[in-house]
Each structure stands twice: as structure tokens, then as C-alpha cells.
Amino acid sequence: MDLYIQIIVVACLTGMTSLLAHRSAAVFHDGIRPILPQLIEGYMNRREAGSIAFGLSIGFVASVGISFTLKTGLLNAWLLFLPTDILGVLAINSLMAFGLGAIWGVLILTCLLPVNQLLTALPVDVLGSLGELSSPVVSAFALFPLVAIFYQFGWKQSLIAAVVVLMTRVVVVRYFPHLNPESIEIFIGMVMLLGIAITHDLRHRDENDIDASGLSVFEERTSRIIKNLPYIAIVGALIAAVASMKIFAGSEVSIFTLEKAYSAGVTPEQSQTLINQAALAEFMRGLGFVPLIATTALATGVYAVAGFTFVYAVDYLSPNPMVAAVLGAVVISAEVLLLRSIGKWLGRYPSVRNASDNIRNAMNMLMEVALLVGSIFAAIKMAGYTGFSIAVAIYFLNESLGRPVQKMAAPVVAVMITGILLNVLYWLGLFVPA
């Protein structure tokens, strides 16, 4: 009976996260978030957005997601939510999105081992190589506030902002390796962008009174998150319930501690101590990710499926799934409402509202560059410069044909086709992986 309940709850969870991705309300992968405004605004179709989501996510599913679960026996966020990002973006309607997500949840609990064997059976490791896409995407996206400053303000302010943002990254990497440099970098960049914009408005108050007319990109996009708050709250409740069932761990900082806590032979006192340690670790990790998640949500209108991830810490400490579900919904709803207040406040300043196009342009340009660079990394990892040559040839073939595949998605499509061709060449005896 317990297994059936677990299957039902997990299926509901993955179905709902797929639905959130389909509605462009929330996703798990930070790199997919800046892509979805393109989909919402009609600059990209679902096939193109789905190919990017697949390329960004599938490597982590095959490596981190499956390997962590096989090692610990616990489900994890990479395994549950990255595939539903892909399925939700690709689905043509809400019902299909929920259904595909729910099917994935059932498959995880019933067919994980055969799926893992299938993913790792190819002679050329396409899925593992696609993991190379993610690092450039997240690192490049962290620069969007800085690039927006370049577009909107003079060279002096741009130079100062560049020095501050880049030195922040250098200092964090050198002296605080436990912190996420992208989250700090994007936070400092947003502070610089907003500080320069608000200072500009205050200096020109007499010439151009500050008013609240019009919507900034922040208020416009946070309002979209608010419209999806009921769905987000349900996901928060389901995440909490699954974690409270002791079958799920939220991140790498807690999964191995929880494995020990839930293992046989551990006394209740020892187990609770380990659970408390895991909850504290998740809370501290969540603090580090608040700047990244909050600022990207404000800029893109797409939230994270687990919010600021504080819901994980609450889940572990809850006495039962029912209490956990209530607390999870409350925590993630409070986070969303706080975002709305921040978005409305920012909308009072004309220069912040005028930053909308610059922010969009910066995100689009950075994503194009990052996906191109990441795809090159992936192609080289597959087959050295043979893979590079094939991928570049396919990319420029798309250019010569008038871009039947949109420019942002083209590198990812090219590297996936490269992986398929390399496996065909292997089976024909024309290529041997290194």
C-alpha cells in the first residue's frame, strides 16, 4: 500500500511540475528560465525551446540524477524535475503536459534500472557530453545585469559595474569556494543595475517626475508568476509530502546525510540528528541561491519549482506528510508574494521600466553565445575535433538554409545530431571513441 501511495504522490508531483513548465511558470533548470520568455512572446516555438531544454538537462538526468538515486536509494530533484522541464516545454497542451509528467513519475519508481542501462548503452556518450552545456549557460546568464548596464548607461558607469561584478566573482571563487559564484554575481549585478537606474531617476526628479504608470519588466513578469500561484503552491505541498515520506532529497548537500539517517541500524536519536544536519545544510544552501532565483524570477517571470529551496528544510523536519504539505505550500506562497512586492516597488522608477528591452536583449544575446560555446564543449567531449567539425558543419548548414532552426536552438540541435551521427559511424566501423 505504501508503494502505491508513493507512486501516486510522485506522479502528481511530476505531473504538476511538467504543467508549470508548460505554462512557463516555473522550471528547475536555471538555464531554461531565460529561454521561456522567448517562447511566451512568440519568438520561439515549442520544438525549438524543447530542444534547448533537452540539451541543457539530459546530461544531468543521466549523470547526477540517476547516479545519486542508484547510490542512495533516494529520489532527487535532478531526476524528478529536469525531465519534466523538457516534457512540459514540448507538450502541446496542459493535459498532455500533466500526463507526460505523471508517466515519468511512475517510470522513475518502477523502471529506473532499465532506463539507466538504456541511457548508458551508447558507445558515444551523448547524454553525458550534453552536460557540458549547462556551465556556460548559467555563467553567461549571471552576466545579464552587467550587459544591460552596458546597453543603457554610459561607459563610465559600465566600466565601474564591470569591475565590481567581475571582481566579486574572483573574490568569491578565491576566498569563498563554498558559495555559488553565479548567484552572488547576478545579485551584485542586479544591485548595480537597479542602483544606477534609481540614482539616475532621483537626480533627474525635477525633469522627469517619478511615477507609477506603466509596468516594468519586473512587475509585468512577477504578475505572471502570481497568476500561477495556486499551481506553484500545490507543487510546494507535493514536494514537501514526498520529502516527508523519506524517499526524496532536495540537493547534493543533504542526500548523502539523509541516506545515513534513513538507513537500517541507526537509532532514532542518531537519525534525527542527521536529519537536523541535512535541514540546516539545505537552509544555508538556500540562502546562497536566493539572489540567483529571486533576480532571475524578477527578470524572466519564471520561478523555480522549489522556490528558494527553503521548502526542503521544512520538509525534512515535518512530523508527517500532511503537516509537511501545508508548510510547503505556505513557505513557497510567501516567497512568491514577496517577489510581487519587490516587483511593484521597482516599477515606480522610469529608468527601471526602461531597462526592460535592455534586459531582454542582454539575456537573448548571452544565451545565444552560451549555448554556442556549451555545444562546442559537448561536441569536443564526444569526439574531440571530429565532433567539433561535424557540429560546426551542421550549424552553418542551418545558417545557409535560412535558419529553419532558430539561432538560439541551432547549436544544441547540431550537437545532438552530431551525437547520433557519431554512434552511426561507430556501428559502421568508421569511428572509435577515445
Curated annotation (Swiss-Prot):
The keyword Membrane applies. It is a multi-pass membrane protein. GO terms for cellular component: plasma membrane. It is found in: Cell membrane. The chain crosses the membrane at residues 50-70, 72-92, 95-115, 135-155, 158-178, 179-199, 229-249, 288-308, 319-339, 376-396, 412-432. The keyword GTP-binding does not apply. Keywords: Cell membrane, Membrane, Transmembrane, Transmembrane helix. InterPro entries: Uncharacterised_YhfT (IPR019733). This is Uncharacterized protein YhfT. It comes from Escherichia coli (strain K12).
